[in-house]
């Protein structure tokens, strides 16, 4: 085998209070092609993935080049970096004869990301609970639950968004967020999505990131007024998400109307329950 194509879904992480630990895979994809042989410079992300892969597997390094295409926008909080890292790692794994199982490839991706909340749903699909230590729990998400995203044209780099966060939190903020994250996990695990209503409130990261995303609260409020169960900042942003069981188009229109950015677009997605796929 000299080339392989790997499809990875977009992901939305945190879901409000589940900071660095909750995420869901979406039916929006990037496809990475990895080809044996010399080509253009790899770039930092692919080179770091390759160094980690060859180092961990002790596979004899080989030259390769790669490309990515698809619909996942960069630096909007939809896991674009995971689509590249998982794509390159799985591509190398296939070309090397599959020395790693899927879960181990996920672990390498999470190591490169620095947190597992996007890497887990990208790898396994569905809704994922991904603790810093311990096994990933993945749950199939039903077709009745829609995810509506308002995606601004401007990017927000994850590193910049993390620099906005405080070093410590009031105990009351941590308790509220932990309780809401547990409720979200329970609702997805049981499939009783009505119980998501009112559970997306967060005091760990969203209040601080809202300083550079002034439309965040108004967009979520508009989505909820139109019937959504709740909303959150997708990953580090800049996209904003709402979950709904009814009239997603109405929710999308409300979210778009509440945003004063002329270049933002609203889309409706369902969950991807497969995760990464080797297309070859």
Region annotations inferred by a language model:
Residues 36-37, 152, 242-246:
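Short beta-strand-to-loop capping motifs
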Residues 1-2, 12-14, 23-26, 58-59, ...:
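Solvent-exposed alpha-helices and their adjacent loops that cap or buttress functional pockets
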Residues 149-211:
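Active-site rim beta-loop-alpha module in soluble metabolic enzymes
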Residues 61-137:
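Gly/Ser-rich oxyanion-binding loop with an adjacent helix/lid
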Residues 1-76, 90, 94, 98-100, ...:
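ATP-binding N-lobe of GHMP and related small-molecule kinases
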Residues 39-43, 158, 247-254:
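Short, conserved charged micro-motifs
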Residues 188-280:
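Glycine-rich, charge-dense phosphate/pyrophosphate-binding loop(s)
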